[in-house]
Amino acid sequence: MLLHIPGLFDADEISRIREALEQADWADGKVTAGYQSAKAKHNLQLPEGHALAKEIGSALIDRLWCNPQFMSAALPHKVFPPLINCYREGGNFGFHIDNALRQPKGSPERIRTDLSSTLFLNDPDSYDGGELVIQDTFGVQQVKLAAGDMVLYPGTSLHKVNPVTRGARYAAFFWTQSLVREDSQRTLLFEMDNAIRQLTADVPEHPSLLQLTGTYHNLLRRWAEV
């Protein structure tokens, strides 16, 4: 499942974030890549624990916990603290699959990367190239969203970032460990939850709603890991 979640940050917030990022001190993005991924990774990144990265990440996570789309699709259990990257002219990241497990710096806890997310932090017309290309059971998708919008997709997906040929591309990225690790099961639950919400709006007194809601929770009970 690939999901577009719009409008997590508004235009004024994005403007302030972009100004801060343009003044930031960046490090080589290879520091958080695995052995194989590092060979394909050519970008910049704010160091883990950087004050600006923590500020943006905290605001993002707070909004996601209140976002019905994210909560329904991801069924989040743990979220890796968001990282911030920058692709300038020539920057790119070849095809790769993210590491299965991630450990936040300074934490003993590991997170299984069931879902990957990218939040775009500048307008798509401010740079050329830089598309996020995701290859999975849904086919090949090229993603280049408006500033403040986020894409959510399976951590098992082969993906890359096309070379930036003009300007700079700023983004936040992170991983989520879901209560339900299997993508097909999460997709089924997401579609079922959406159908229940729509039926509740259209025919709120329909007797089948109780049964459908019960079936949703029984499936979640069967598949969830806590």
UniProtKB/Swiss-Prot annotation:
Pfam families hit by this protein: 2OG-FeII_Oxy_3, PKHD_C
HAMAP family: Hydroxyl_YbiX
Protein name, as recorded: PKHD-type hydroxylase PSEEN1031
Top-tier EC class: oxidoreductase
Binding site for 2-oxoglutarate: 169
An example Gene Ontology molecular-function term: 2-oxoglutarate-dependent dioxygenase activity
Its EC number(s): 1.14.11.-
GO aspect biological process, one term: DNA damage response
Chain positions recorded as Fe cation binding sites: 96, 98, 159
Cofactor: Fe(2+); L-ascorbate
Keyword terms, alphabetized: Dioxygenase, Iron, Metal-binding, Oxidoreductase, Vitamin C
SUPFAM superfamilies assigned to the protein according to its UniProt record, in alphabetical order: Clavaminate synthase-like
Cofactor note (record): Binds 1 Fe(2+) ion per subunit.
NCBIfam families registered for this protein in UniProt: PRK05467.1-3, PRK05467.1-4
Lineage, broadest ranks: Bacteria, Pseudomonadati, Pseudomonadota, Gammaproteobacteria, Pseudomonadales
